[in-house]
Structures are given as C-alpha cells and as structure tokens.
C-alpha cells in the first residue's frame, strides 16, 4: 500500500490562465447567454494537434498501463504520485474508462472494500460507511470517478481510451532473455473488426515496463496473460478458480509481480495467469494489487539502465 499522502487542495477555476475573448460573452441565464464565436476547423485542429502530439511524445513511455479499471487506475495514481518524473501512458480499450468498477455486484450500486484498503479512500477523499472489517461506498461510481479525475489531473499521466492493445512487443534483451518491450495498439473499433476488413495495421508504444490490468471478462480480458501462452513465453494459463473472497484477495495482492521480464500482471488478470480464486464484488484487492504493481514498476526501473525506452543494462 502506498504511504498516506496529504490531500490535494481542489484547483480553483481562477488559477487557470485565461485569454480575453475576441468579442463580448455573457453568462446571463435570463435569455441572453452568449458564447464566443468559433470556426469548425478550430475545433478539429485543437483536438488533432493535442492528440497527435501526445501520440508522438508517448511513442516512447516509461510505463504503459494496459487497462483503466480499478487496478490499473490505482497503479497509475500510486506510480504518478511517487514518481512524477515518469511518463505514464494508460491504454484503455473502452470508450469509458473504469472497467467493472462503476457498479458493485449484480449491477447494484454500492461498492464494498475490505480493510486495510479503505486507507486509499481517505487519501482520495471518498466518503464511506464503516462496517467494521469492511467499508461501503454508497455508489461505486463515486470511487471510480474520483480516482479517474485525480489520475488524469497528474501532469505525467496520459490516457488513450477507445484504444486496444493487440499484441506485445517482444525483444531479446541485453542478457539474451525474451523481454516484453512495449505494446502494439489500434483503435478498438478496428481491433474488433479485423474479420470484416483487410490490412488495418497497428501502431506501437515502446516502454521498459508494461503493467497489464485487463481483468478477466470481456473481449480483451486477460489479454496479456493469454498472449504469453500464444507467443510461447508461458506454457499454459493457470485459469481462474471459483469464488473465495478470503483466499482470493490476499492472493492477488501478494502475487502481483513481473511474470516475464518487462511485464507486470495486476488485478484479476493475474488470477487467470496464476489459477487463483476470484473474489467477486469486493474491490480492496484491486486497490492493493494496483499499488503493489506501482512499487514493482519502480523497482524494475531503479535496477535497470534504460535508453530511449529500452532496457540496455
């Protein structure tokens, strides 16, 4: 678990630099609300310039996190907080980040988090009801939206959502080992339609550390773990076992690690790799596993020499 941090003060609107509008505007809600004028091309260029500048810059990243569910976002928050010098790039296949953390079990809204993971809620400023051995957030979206907003506010974090990881970059490293050296990406709509169209080649992001947090459900579930098998880096999957909350959560947190050089598995993806139990609608392990993945990523970076996104010593 990451050490407790002082809560960040909310950013006030007047802290942002403002340029004067070219014409008079008005926030009069009595029928006289006036916007500053804009050209359609200005909107397009404003988006394109920033997005593709981000793609250009993050073609080499320090850490890529695959999946923006509760484990991936917890990892991103912890990592960005501890190491603001790192370029952290989150790749999320869904249009809406958050994975399965927008609801609790069976589409119900409350979220259950076992102690001691409740410390993270206090760090984020998320209110909850204390039930003794666990706490309950009144709506899972309160936790997820708070965490997501804080992650995206970190200046060293970018997220590319609606973007799927289609493959892993695997190179022989300085020691002669096969090492995961980055990810292969594409628009999710393209990735899901390779059977309907031809020749839609992907893009790449190079990074010395990949944290895969793709869960176990859905079309992209446990993607990296499954790809390790098909590439021959892993003999077979352990396959997730049946539900046992008391066995599952500590197994996921304690088992979070670098499973092959350059690739850390976290969250429920690890259960498919290791053959551990599922825990169902309790989220403490996702927080703890994400934090441990951040610590593992820092440990890997600290013990290797990295040049242009590649581990060289």
Curated annotation (Swiss-Prot):
A Pfam family: Thi4
Entry GO terms, CC: cytosol; nucleus
Sites where the protein binds substrate: 71, 92-93, 100, 165, 201, 216, 268, 278-280
SUPFAM superfamilies per record: FAD/NAD(P)-binding domain
Post-translational modification: During the catalytic reaction, a sulfide is transferred from Cys-199 to a reaction intermediate, generating a dehydroalanine residue.
List of residues that carry 2,3-didehydroalanine (Cys): 199
Subunit structure: Homooctamer.
Function: Involved in biosynthesis of the thiamine precursor thiazole. Catalyzes the conversion of NAD and glycine to adenosine diphosphate 5-(2-hydroxyethyl)-4-methylthiazole-2-carboxylic acid (ADT), an adenylated thiazole intermediate. The reaction includes an iron-dependent sulfide transfer from a conserved cysteine residue of the protein to a thiazole intermediate. The enzyme can only undergo a single turnover, which suggests it is a suicide enzyme. May have additional roles in adaptation to various stress conditions and in DNA damage tolerance.
Name of the featured protein: Thiamine thiazole synthase
